[in-house]
Each structure stands twice: as structure tokens, then as C-alpha cells.
């Protein structure tokens, strides 16, 4: 039997701005952000498992994932809309979970894109169910304005600056739920910036980057709460 092995690249991202402007009725927070996609630095190898297995097998190398893998959630959601053989997936992780770079969402988006190949529109997955950052990886190019809880993606297709970055990842990580819990404890329902000002701010950051101008410390509402939890964070700045 011929087995087709599919090798997929998986990206991560940077939040060049990240403002939380309120809490929604569905429990999620309202965001305004400028996203930049980092080069593909992780990979998935996928092959159908036509043997006796009735479950998927996911092998992870590189970094350790504790708890449920987001790829399991993608496959569970996919099978509600489409037929999917049991799969054998090898995921090579480079970015530690809880780093805020969205690498797990990048993994999910890579798998969703593969699952959506040659599917009818009514079968395709949108990505919102898997995670708030997933729509960006599915809909955008390198740059995008992102709003809502992450589902509203406005790709920026005009000529964009060449962007080089040095990404420093600390030895500790923090779950998204924990980070938002700390933020809510600090601000309650009154966050530092409203939606209009957050949109103006991200546009200003983008314009300065396009003009090769220095902006300074990029705005991120999580900075102060993370600094309180991990004072060594300040050494980076």
C-alpha cells in the first residue's frame, strides 16, 4: 500500500502592539493588535494510519507539551464536519508553550490548512474553534491588524517594511488563561485604552516601522502584570 507522507511548515507570530480594551459577553476579551508572522520554524509530518489503529497518534519532539495538544482539538472538530482517517503526526516543536508567540496556533493552522485541501466550502474549518490566534495564520500574510478575540483579521497588503527581529524566550511560560486572569485582577473592567485609541496606536506603530523610525518599547498590556510575576523580565529592557 502506498503511504503518502505530508510535511508541513508551521509559523509563529509577534504582537507588535497588544491592547485589551474590554471583556465581552461570551467571556472572551476584546483585543486590538498588530501581528507580524515569524518565519516557519516548526514542522508537522502527517501520514494516514491505515493499520489497526482507530485513534490518532501524535509524537512531539523538541519542546514538551503538557496537557492536551491543540492538534487533538483540531481533529476532534474536523471529524464533526468531514471524514478523516486516523493519522500519525510527528510535531517538531522549537518554541516553548506559553511563550506568547502563538506557535501552538501555528501548528493548528497548518493542520487545518491541510485538512481543508480539496474540501467543499461547507466542510472547511475556519479555525476560531481551535484558538484565538489561529485565524491570523489562516487568513493573513505577514502583517495584519487583528481585533475581536482574534477572529477579525485585516491583512495588510500594501508594501510593508523589511522586518528583522531577535526573539528572546525566557525559561518560564504562562498560559493564556493565567495571563488574562492577572490582567483582569489588575484592571477589572476598566482597561488602559479604548478601541479607538488602540487602533490609532497600532497605526502609529506601523507607520513608524514603515519609515524606519524608532518607536521605543512596543505597547503591550501584559507587560506590567508579567513584570510583577517575573521581575527578571525587566532585564530584557
Question: Where does each model-flagged region fall?
Answer:
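ATP-binding N-lobe of GHMP and related small-molecule kinases
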Residues: 2-99, 116-120, 158-160, 169-172
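Gly/Ser/Thr-rich beta-alpha loop segments that engage phosphate groups in nucleotides
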Residues: 24, 29, 100-108, 149-150
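Residues at the starts of beta-strands that form the adenosine-phosphate
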Residues: 43, 124, 164
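Charged catalytic carboxylate motif
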Residues: 70, 107, 232
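Conserved, helical-rich catalytic subdomain that frames metal- and/or nucleotide-binding sites
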Residues: 55-56, 139-140, 144-237
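DPxDG-like acidic metal-binding loop motif
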Residues: 99-124, 128, 136-140
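Short amphipathic alpha-helical segments and helix-helix/interface helices
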Residues: 32-35, 124-127, 237
Amino acid at each position: 500500500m502506498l503511504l503518502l507522507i505530508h510535511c508541513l511548515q508551521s509559523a509563529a507570530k509577534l504582537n507588535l502592539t497588544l491592547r485589551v480594551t474590554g471583556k465581552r459577553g461570551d467571556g472572551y476579551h476584546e483585543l486590538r493588535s498588530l501581528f507580524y508572522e515569524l518565519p516557519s520554524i516548526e514542522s508537522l509530518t502527517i501520514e494516514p494510519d491505515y493499520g489497526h489503529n482507530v485513534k490518532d497518534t501524535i509524537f512531539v519532539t523538541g519542546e514538551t507539551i503538557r496537557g492536551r495538544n491543540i492538534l487533538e482539538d483540531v481533529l476532534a472538530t474536523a471529524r464533526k464536519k468531514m471524514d478523516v482517517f486516523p493519522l500519525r503526526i510527528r510535531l517538531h516543536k522549537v518554541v516553548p508553550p506559553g511563550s506568547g508567540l502563538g506557535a501552538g496556533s501555528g501548528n493548528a493552522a497548518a493542520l487545518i490548512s491541510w485538512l481543508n485541501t480539496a474540501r467543499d466550502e461547507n466542510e472547511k474549518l475556519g479555525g476560531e474553534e481551535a484558538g484565538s490566534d489561529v485565524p491570523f495564520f489562516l487568513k493573513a500574510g505577514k502583517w495584519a491588524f487583528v481585533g475581536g478575540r482574534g477572529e477579525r483579521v485585516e491583512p495588510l497588503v500594501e508594501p510593508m517594511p523589511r522586518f528583522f527581529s531577535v526573539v528572546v524566550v525566557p525559561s518560564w511560560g504562562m498560559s493564556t488563561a493565567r495571563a488574562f486572569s492577572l490582567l483582569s485582577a489588575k484592571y477589572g473592567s476598566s482597561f488602559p485604552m479604548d478601541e479607538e485609541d488602540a487602533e490609532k496606536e497600532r497605526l502609529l506603530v506601523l507607520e513608524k516601522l514603515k519609515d524606519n523610525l524608532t518607536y521605543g518599547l512596543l505597547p503591550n498590556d501584559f507587560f506590567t502584570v508579567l513584570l510583577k510575576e517575573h521581575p527578571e523580565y525587566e532585564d530584557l529592557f
